[in-house]
Amino acid sequence: MTLQSQKAILSSFIEGAPPGELADVVADIKNLTSSTPNLINELGPAFQKYNEEQFTTVKLPGSSQHVIISSHNSLGGSRYYDVETSTSFAFDHTTQKASAVETYVVEGAQGDLTKSVIKALAPYVKEHYSNAAYGAWPIENDSKVAIIIVANKYSPNNYWNGRWRSLYILDPAAGTVEGSIKVDVHYYEDGNVRLLTDKPVTASVSATGAAIVKEISAVEKKYQEELNRSFASLSEGAFKALRRQLPVTRQKIEWEKIAGYRLGQDIGGGGARR
């Protein structure tokens, strides 16, 4: 296999890493490429693609607030900026660490609207999401505004991790917002199940921060309700059909006897009694 083929395969592993599991994927890659340890250092573009597409969040040095990494707030050269904190910073895509923080003030035609959206987003995100980050940035020569919400929920002790990503592109001149809501959940106890959804969004809005966030709230609430109905349908339909049926013996279960069994001996049948 050529070096380029190896890099392409390893890059696909990185870009497809489930939420909260990039470090595990990197560890596996290092084990697979132990004979060429420097190969991981050549996968920078894959790490950048993952971080920007997954809206990776990072805490700036000396701050407790998370900021977002995306193509919409990139300044080039692995530097990004955040409107709410009026800062720009360097970001290492491999280690996912921020550094070299500088003051960065957003101005221009959509500057006030962008700040208005962020002000309205703050209480909405705080009320409806845990461990979430949000942001808004002028894009396309200051003609539109990109709005992002990302919420992460990691529960490795229970063998699942999940991420919610919302991206909306606001066109103030047209009075429209277009985008998508993506949900990625990985469950890996006694199996490997991954839920990936992509919901396109189109709506008409007034060009005020409060009105825009009100529409976002309505769209996201409706989609969450749709997801809940889909989960219930899967549980009672496809997933139920996959479950192994318990045998019907028509015999009473002796619960007291079962409670007295010694795990690994009576139930497992292993080892002699002491």
Curated annotation (Swiss-Prot):
Cited PANTHER family: F-ACTIN-CAPPING PROTEIN SUBUNIT ALPHA
Full protein name: F-actin-capping protein subunit alpha
Subcellular compartments: Cytoplasm
GO terms (BP aspect): actin cytoskeleton organization; barbed-end actin filament capping
Entry function: F-actin-capping proteins bind in a Ca(2+)-independent manner to the fast growing ends of actin filaments (barbed end) thereby blocking the exchange of subunits at these ends. Unlike other capping proteins (such as gelsolin and severin), these proteins do not sever actin filaments.
One Gene Ontology MF term: actin filament binding
SUPFAM superfamilies named among the record's database cross-references: Subunits of heterodimeric actin filament capping protein Capz
InterPro entries reported in the protein's UniProt record: CapZ_alpha (IPR002189), CapZ_alpha/beta (IPR037282), CapZ_alpha/beta_2 (IPR042276), CapZ_alpha_1 (IPR042489), F-actin_cap_asu_CS (IPR017865)
GO cellular component: actin cortical patch; F-actin capping protein complex
Pfam families assigned: F-actin_cap_A
Family designation: Belongs to the F-actin-capping protein alpha subunit family.
Quaternary structure (record): Heterodimer of an alpha and a beta subunit.
Top-level taxon of origin: Eukaryota
